[in-house]
Structures are given as structure tokens and as C-alpha cells.
């Protein structure tokens, strides 16, 4: 859950609601609604969409936004493609190349309709000569044209509310970790927007340890949490024993 705050009642209520329990993000939904917040339900059958390719051009003081987005896409592809050994060097190179190509139109004319979606990356991978590119594209296919294509759309959700709850409990086993990673990237975009408005952002995440099991994804998660803190984000996980065991 994402909450920009300025010391108002919701901060106390959220802390009291969490108490000593392990809070599932969905458990916050009734509270968020009572506080006139926004609950965003993401599932294979929902009509709420988050585009994992969304790029905020003002997301870093010291690093290219495109480089940071490439790190995120590499982490996403590791969950989809990597297996036990993670992405291989050639696979990483191909993905990074295609990420930089897929944003050309948007960087030249940064309007919402030029923002790429996952299918644009998939099509670029198909155009590459290396057999590794075809392997990656085939692994992505189910998330683009198959039954798990919930993240192959332009974003259509409103995250301007002071309190936002992402409910991903219905994503299922195949999509849960991907959903967590995509939400984390969306929260990072919001942290940067709030920072520009001189606001802090409190972020509660359940089962964060699931993002620490793959090397690339763990590295990205650790790096993004450092950035959260630097940019005025206040991230909070659940049971510390799960994090230490991950």
C-alpha cells in the first residue's frame, strides 16, 4: 500500500490497524475505502491495468531513468525467463538493447500514447537475430498474447489519491511475484512525484521476501528500497524472519 502523508489521522489508523499482525495488502482495503482512499484490484480478469513499461523521466538525480527502467525490466524478465540460474549474460545484453530501442518514440515525443507496452518489447525481441532473443520472446508470449496478459496494457488506474491500496491477492501463483515487482516500480514512480511536491510516501508491502529469491530481482529490490529512503519514501515490510531467511 502506498500513502503520501503529512501527519494526519490515517498514519495513526494504519499503524493501529497493522498492529503486530502480518497484514495482507487486501486486508487494508476496507480501511482505505473508509478513509476515502483508492483500492486498485489487479487480477487476470480485472479491468484495472498497470503498464510495467511506464517510464518517469524525472525519476533520478544521478542515473539515467532509462538505465533504471532497464534494471527493472531485467528483473521482470528474470522472474519470467531466468529459472534457477537466472538470466545469462547474452540474455541480459539482448534485453537491455531492446529496452533502449523500445523507448525511442516516447523519448522523442514523451506523450502518454507513445508509452510502449510489453507487447512492443516482445515484438522487438522477435526481430533480433540471436536465438536467445527468440527464447526470451517465447517465454514472454503467455504474458503478452496468452492467458496471463494482464500486464500488457496501458495504465488506466488513478493513483492521485492520498492513500492507494494495490490488491493483488487474486493474481494467482504464476503472477504474484511479477505483480509485486510491477507494483513496486509503480510506487517508485509515485515516490518521485511526491518528492517533487515535498511529500513523504509511506509504503507497506506484504511478503517482500518473495522478491529476494532471484539474484537480479533481489539486487533491484535492494537498490530501489535504498532509493525510496533517499527520495522520501518510508518502506515497511512484514515479518523480519522471512526477510532474513530469503
Go through each PLM region and give its residues:
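C-terminal regions of RecA-like/P-loop NTPase motor modules
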Residues: 245-246
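P-loop NTPase motor domains
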Residues: 26-37, 42-46, 51-233, 237
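A short beta-strand-to-loop transition that corresponds to the Sensor-1 phosphate-sensing loop
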Residues: 238-242
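Short linear segments in intrinsically disordered or otherwise low-structure-confidence regions
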Residues: 17-18
